[in-house]
Amino acid sequence: MFRYLIDGSLNEFLKEYQADVVILQEVRSSLADEVTCYTHKISPNLYQEIENIKKTIYLTVALCKDDTWQKVNIDHFHYNNRFVKIKNDDWSIFGLHLPLQDDIDSLLSIIQESDCDIICGDFNAHRKYSQIKNWKVIDNLINDKGYSDLWEKGLKEEKAYYIDYKGEKKKAQQGNFYRTFVGNTHIDYVLAKADIHLIDIVIDMRTLAFTDHCAMIVNCKKDKS
């Protein structure tokens, strides 16, 4: 989940992981088609259907390996471009890019009502600054709605890893700090419901070569009830 520049690096990175779903934030609408390794792309409602969209608008976009994934409309006039909700027969995912401290209460209600298996993206929230409004979203989803922070879960269960700038994969250690943003903060999160079983989670720092965020890669499955 990250903002990026189209120069071939992103396509090579996506080919390496072959993820079932990729959520990208701040994708300039005019450049989205240059992501060539995924053919099923889902943009926020209103934007996918408009041909003459302003080329400067940045979108949160879902790239899906197959066309079983469908878009679910989200209704928020000012911030439709920042959210994308997708689902198939087994999963539901909510990708977001929260504005910093702006209209958080109304946005929180939309996120809560989504009731998705996974909520992920750039929350613009960091534990060191838990007094800002954006942290309220994470706090509510974890403490009131029963979601778990998969990175913290991975650290506790020894399932968290990071890939350094040389491409070496190493186990992440609980108590250490791992940034997800060039500004030396951890502002990107993957939150999941209790029935999501984490296999592993990775912060890949190599993406800082072509974006200002580290990618977060999650391997998980849904427990059978």
Question: Each PLM stretch: what is its role?
Answer:
Residues 1-35, 222-225:
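N-terminal, active-site-proximal structural segment of metallo-dependent hydrolase catalytic domains
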Residues 2-6, 29-33, 101-103, 125-131, ...:
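Active-site environment of divalent metal-dependent phosphoester hydrolases
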Residues 21-24, 54-71, 88, 92, ...:
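Conserved beta strand-loop-helix elements of the APE1-like EEP
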Residues 205-225:
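Surface polyanion/phosphate-binding segment centered on an Asp-His-Pro turn
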Residues 8-16, 84-87, 103-117:
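Short, basic/hydrophobic alpha-helical segments
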Residues 21, 103-193:
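Metal-dependent phosphoesterases centered on the DNase I-like endonuclease/exonuclease/phosphatase
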Residues 1, 27, 96-98, 122-123, ...:
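Active-site metal-binding loops of divalent metal-dependent hydrolases
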